[in-house]
Amino acid sequence: MITHVEFTLTGPAHGRPFAADATYQATGQPQPVVVFLHGFKGFKDWGHFGLLADFFAEQGFVFVKLNLSHNGVVVGGTGDLEDLEAFGHNNFCLELDDLGQLLDALHTPGATPLPPTLLDLKRLYLIGHSRGGGIVLLKAGEDPRVRAVATWAAVADLHPRWPAEILADWQRAGVLHVPNVRTGQQLPLYYQLAENYFAHLPRLDLPSRLPRLRQPLLLVHGEPDETVPLTAAYQLKNQKPDAELLILSDAPHNFGGAHPWLAAQLPGPARAAAERTAAFFAGLA
């Protein structure tokens, strides 16, 4: 029987609570742990992510997913993007620190409702989608507790290559708005996002950090990805030549999913990505 447990963490620096959940099948034996990170404008309960959790639980993993603290989702709220002010104050260091706090909590008995005997934390794996892929690569590089990483449709660089004129206008106005096509919202991005990136470049420069990544890496990308081109996967592969690259011929950026996702099964491309990822993790010594 699949068990689903929800819990809340609070960032010690920013004081903002954020939700996480774990899905698993109790077998009486410690199980490897997969932590899944959503991307830009995403959240832990988007679309088919709940079915992903069930799939990995059926494969013998404890599957943990979280809402980043400043992704716009409110604990106890609608479950969708609603706190646009928080969204606007998100930055890459916050995301890394939120993920790090979750990893710390998993290693701290009593910090989550999960029994310590359930977790085989010597087999701790990360999956990141889209921008979340870039974040999990950086986190693995700074946290040796991570055993291996898989990215799905990951960006090759957190630097969006803002043109100089856009940066200048953004700095003058203090805020830049980007559309959320799904909801029709105009999402604010405060200039602190750019300031945070440039102030912490040694930590956030993925092209310079990825070649030093020691953990095994699986790169999964769709050939028809309409948001992050397939060239990003080739760039990541060039920076870490020993990474395994899986190209799915039929996988758009969200691997066939949509929000809400009403079907009882995973979309085909998402299942293909999940099957290969589960096998990749299970095959590691």
Range-by-range predicted roles:
Residues 112-129:
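Alpha/beta-hydrolase fold nucleophile elbow
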